[in-house]
Amino acid sequence: EEAAALERKVPAQEQQQLQAASETFLALWKPANTADPKGAVIIVPGAGETADWPQAIGPLRQKLPNAEWSSLSITLPDLQSDAIAPRVVEATAAPKAPETGSKDATTAQPIEQAAGGEAEVADQVVAETTEEQSKADAERIFARIDAAIAYAEQQSARRIVVLGHGTGAYWAARYLSERQTAQVEKFVMVDAQAPAKAKPPLAELTPTLKLPTADIFYMDKPLDRHAALERMQASKRLKTPAFSQVALRALPDNKAEQEQLFRRVRGWLNPQTPD
């Protein structure tokens, strides 16, 4: 269990058990290293990532307090829509053909038709189930972001920023687009990825955001570069206010790469701080 592993590794004073609807989840809180914090950054990890993931999540949550921002890194639920078995057809038993050899040929055609009809129904069931589970996933994730915002407010955070990494950036963008919560002032996407079959796509979501947004991506990957270009073009078409992009190059040394990312995030959060 990833949460149990984190509980053993992370200092107890950083661990917070937050309540979201009917479930509790682990969040990691680090207060800003100043008497006058600028606010709190809520960090949303991507699929398969923990609240202290070594890429982006952990380094940012550890470094942001030195930039006068508290950090609150949350864990996301296991998504139902990721665990769908597509072979629903097998759940429906096909009619048995007669065992007598002479009549097999006459019964083959209606059996094939029946099996074909069942496959179409099964495909529709899979599509409907996927949509239902995707909505359920979104509600569970939104409840966790709600709980994180409430906790940051309890800690008297003057300003609240949401930062999403990987698919966490997609879910955070969905949350901010659908909820349009007044408590969140800024949004940062890092290496944004959309989950498989995600609707709406990320390029349709980002132009709907009504708050300053930084889209940080890695230019080394052609697919990511193309997706970032789509997001920029969509934002220009809708004249999205305060949408900016930052292109980074991947560095061979992970520590240097994480420091580069932190400097870009810090520079956007604290414009007066020299890079």
What is each PLM-predicted segment?
Residues 162-173:
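Gly/Ala-rich beta-loop-alpha elbow adjacent to hydrolase catalytic centers
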Residues 83-155:
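Alpha/beta-hydrolase active-site loop
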Residues 241-275:
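C-terminal catalytic histidine-bearing segment of alpha/beta-hydrolase fold enzymes
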Residues 61-85, 90-91:
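Conserved alpha/beta-hydrolase
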Residues 37-46:
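Short beta-strand element of the alpha/beta-hydrolase
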Residues 51-58:
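The serine-hydrolase catalytic nucleophile loop
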Residues 1-32:
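N-terminal cap/lid segment of alpha/beta-hydrolase-fold proteins
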Residues 181, 185-252:
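The feature captures the conserved acid-bearing segment of alpha/beta-hydrolase catalytic domains
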